């Protein structure tokens, strides 16, 4: 991030931290923001886990900080607050956790997305790293499943087989995440994807479409489609493609019908 972006981020998170503290709430930065931050990638999407009613807290945050409240998932209590700070736009996604943050992380999908840090800790660390010596601190990363190690080894690893039972769109997300980051899906996770590949047919089409479009927008799209086929996902989604496997074409064509279709 550039200095203006870091300054805007610190200001936004400071305001949020002060608001949560007034209500005696704990807040943690979790998931994709931590992953991307450790990779040195800038992002303006920040997932915040709070120990209270996330919808109520998000409503208060939008009101106090002059942001826009967006209800994302009423059933699961997830809301977004869009905030403009110093010409930078931030998307704060709020969810609730009960008990300890480790239990919340255990319900996530992949190890590299199952890391967190306390909000105040992150602010202190970023201030120190950005030339504010009055707030020297060391970031305390909450990483019960070895996500940082997998991040360093460039691996996408499922927390358990239950993640695919809970939401089969994660089958596609594993491949898309690996493709975006230029990571590898680790062998046991590949085995689980093959095992659960047919369950992708139970997912609403719009969710499948979103993941596929994101995957196809990346470089080497044909390679990613072949990988989906190796994992049993491609034919689960488009079974008609299977009819072209091994069907030869006139000599002017090098590939069979299936490969030509890809």
Task: Describe these PLM feature segments.
Residues 1-262:
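Catalytic cores of the polymerase beta-like nucleotidyltransferase superfamily
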């Amino acid at each position: 991030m550039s200095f203006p972006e870091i300054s805007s981020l610190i200001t936004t998170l400071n305001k949020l931290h002060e608001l949560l503290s007034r209500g005696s709430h704990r807040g943690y930065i979790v998931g994709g923001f931590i992953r991307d931050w450790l990779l040195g990638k800038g992002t303006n999407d920040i997932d915040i886990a709070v120990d209270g009613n996330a919808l109520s807290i998000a409503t208060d945050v939008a009101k106090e900080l002059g942001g826009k409240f967006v209800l994302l998932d009423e059933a699961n209590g997830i809301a977004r607050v869009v905030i403009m700070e110093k010409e930078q736009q931030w998307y704060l996604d709020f969810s609730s956790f009960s008990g300890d943050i480790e239990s919340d992380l255990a319900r996530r999908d992949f190890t590299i997305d199952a890391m967190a840090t306390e909000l105040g800790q992150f602010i202190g660390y970023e201030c120190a790293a950005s030339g504010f010596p009055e707030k020297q601190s060391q970031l305390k990363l909450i990483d019960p499943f070895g996500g940082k190690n997998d991040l360093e080894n460039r691996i996408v690893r499922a927390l358990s087989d239950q993640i695919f039972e809970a939401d089969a769109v994660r089958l596609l997300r594993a491949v898309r995440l690996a493709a975006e980051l230029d990571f590898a899906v680790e062998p046991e996770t590949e085995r689980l994807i093959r095992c659960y590949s047919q369950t992708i047919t139970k997912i609403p089409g719009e969710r499948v479409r979103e993941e596929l479009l994101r995957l196809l927008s990346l470089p080497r799209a044909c390679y990613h489609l072949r990988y989906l086929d190796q994992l049993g996902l491609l034919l689960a989604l488009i079974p008609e493609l299977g009819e072209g496997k091994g069907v030869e074409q006139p000599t002017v064509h090098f590939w069979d019908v299936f490969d030509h279709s890809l």
